[in-house]
Amino acid sequence: FNKTVLARTEFYASELNNARFNSIKLTDVKFTASDLRKTIFEHCEFNGVCFKSCDMKGISFDGQVFVDVKFDNADLANSSFRGVILRNVSFRPTFALTNKYYKSIKTIDFDGASMDKLTYAALKGVGVSLENIVLL
């Protein structure tokens, strides 16, 4: 996918290994139970996107924009959000907060990210290290 717009699109149980999303505007897109570990996102804008029960270990979202995005039960261990803009973004675990979830979310790198106060408070509340963050 290169320099396109994806609107109201759904990826269900998809294995998107080596798929490349370059300069894409994703609006109201749903990724459900998908393997995104080797998916590449570059220069994308995420608006109203939902990542539900996706395997996203080690993925890099560096320098991208997220507005009204939900990460519902998504495994983001060792992923990178360096220099991103986060507005009204939620990171929701399964119905129970487990030690595995706390350990996993603490491995996410938010260095240099800009985020609204609500997103900041939610991440800080689960113990994420938020140094070098800019509040919007």
Where are these regions (language model features)?
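Tandem repeat scaffolds
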Residues: 1-136
